[in-house]
Amino acid sequence: MAVKDQLRVDREFKKTPTGRLFFDSMTARITDLSNVRILACSVDTVRQLYRGLIRPEIMSLFDKPGTIVDFAGQRWHSGRVSKDSGYQYKLQNADLGIILLVKNFNAKLENIGPHLKIEVSPHAIDQFCPERLQERLDYYADHVLTNVERNQCAVHLALDLQGWQPPADLVARMHCRARAARDISGIKEIQWTLESATYGKGQSYLFGSAGGVQLGIYNKTEQARAIDKLDYWENVWRRRDSFDEADPDNYDTEQDVWRVELRYHHSVIQQFASGSFDLHSGETIETNSYAAFAPHLDGLWRYGLRQFKLLARPGYFEPIWTLIRDDVRVDLPVDSLVDETEYKRQYKTSRGFSGKNVELFLGNFVSLLARERVGARKAFYRLKDWECWPVIRDHYA
């Protein structure tokens, strides 16, 4: 059964697509969202991946990890990174807000492979339009690799708002296909895009898996304060303020900001690039870069809020979910193609290569585990760390 929206009305109880009053026809309950302030909806993270052959001179930058090196006309901090990242080395420039992850763990140095991922922080994304940012990323890629080609991107979309906070029963009322749901109360340690944050009160919720689509809901004020970035974010949140200091739609320094964040893995972006098509020409969009995909981010925002459904009662969306799905647009200086594109994900079928080979692999894998007396828990965690885990998971989904 398709989930429906409650009736949107104005103060005179006339139906309107922009009303902030929501009427539940079964319970006769009216929800007033007039005091909800949409502060910003932005791209919080970009990860651009590249394939190519690592230039010979690049590896010398990592001879002494932890030192400052010259690269592409700028000063960078070189170092090693954990195997969990999938890469061996990094070049980081905190002033630019850019990290280059170099040398894929699962590809040989002398071979062409997925050897580069560039991670971009919010303040760097904010400084450049998508085209200019893409030019900068491609510039760095050309200095790291030869035979370079773009290998898709990953994006995080973040909505910051005031006048709303998650209900206590959020987890129970959030419906989604994802198996993973976490309620992080405390708050404990959370891994953010470019840093680790530990802070001590509030709540944070995370739904979905890192290898697919994730929904995060958390207190952005607390998180920004914990990493000493509150001044930066308050400047961002004030951008929509009017000249009237008493305007109720202005950012309120006395009220916490909550963030609703959708995180799209690069494999999911690839599914959209292969399965989505232009309504006029019928051609698939076939993008492989952040700049090319930027006009489609409104479509991803709407898609995510239909995949993760916050319900008021069975069959009906919570009013806040309708509001942020229909009224919010991603703040980017590009023309949105959301009304000109049909968004679909093209999944690999389980017939043929991936299906047959997954089943054969798992059969042999289990036999080897039994022979070597490896416990089920240890084996499962090792399997989840493997790059082919998303293929196995999707096959049995």
Predicted feature locations:
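Structured, helix-rich domain cores that form ligand/interaction pockets
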Residues: 1-343, 356-397
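Helix-turn-helix DNA-binding segment
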Residues: 346-351
